[in-house]
From Swiss-Prot:
Belongs to the LuxS family. The keyword Secreted does not apply. The gene is luxS. GO terms for biological process: quorum sensing. GO terms for molecular function: iron ion binding; S-ribosylhomocysteine lyase activity. Gene3D superfamilies: S-ribosylhomocysteinase (LuxS). This is S-ribosylhomocysteine lyase.
Length: 165
């Protein structure tokens, strides 16, 4: 089985919150696909609560699109990591990490402005596979920590494990 790119970086050196351009690739028609690591917590030190990360998934999907999408960049997907330390975001285009950082911080401010769980998008049994597993408070706590700490930018080359450098 091939080793995935995400396992070629030293997770013990990852700061958080931080954004990292994990990889870029070209489609057969020449479009650029960029994959970003949005690391909310330090790996193996802390993890996001299951209700908090689930609610954040619903909120960040729309907010990041509002702040990052433009004529040259379109978010394909933002998915939580199985380790519950962050999200992977795939986009058509090549935004730089600083644009992603600004969009992420703006999105966290948007999360803090949500007043009621009824305002969480797709929070119903028809559009969500676990509609009871949400917490606006926990998502807002996550957003506040991101804003309090500030988002930094990681360099993938500096994080490569020596066998892959």
């Amino acid at each position: 089985m091939p080793l995935l790119d995400s396992f070629k970086v030293d997770h013990t050196k990852m700061p958080a919150p931080a954004v990292r351009l994990a990889k870029t690739m070209q489609t057969p028609k020449g479009d650029t696909i960029s994959v970003f690591d949005l690391r909310f917590t330090r790996p193996n030190c802390e993890l996001l609560s299951e209700k908090g990360i689930h609610t954040m998934e619903h909120l960040i999907a729309g907010f990041m699109r509002e702040h990052l999408n433009n004529t040259r960049v379109e978010i394909i997907d933002i998915s939580p990591m199985g380790c519950r330390t962050g999200f992977y975001m795939s986009v058509v285009g090549a935004p730089n990490e600083y644009n992603v950082k600004e969009a992420w911080e703006s999105s966290m401010r948007d999360v803090l402005r949500i007043c009621d769980e009824k305002d969480i998008p797709e929070l119903n049994i028809y559009q969500c596979g676990t509609a009871k597993m949400h917490s606006l408070k926990e998502a807002q706590d996550i957003a506040q920590v991101v804003l309090d700490k500030g988002v930094s930018v990681m360099n993938t080359q500096e994080l490569l494990l020596k066998d892959f450098a």
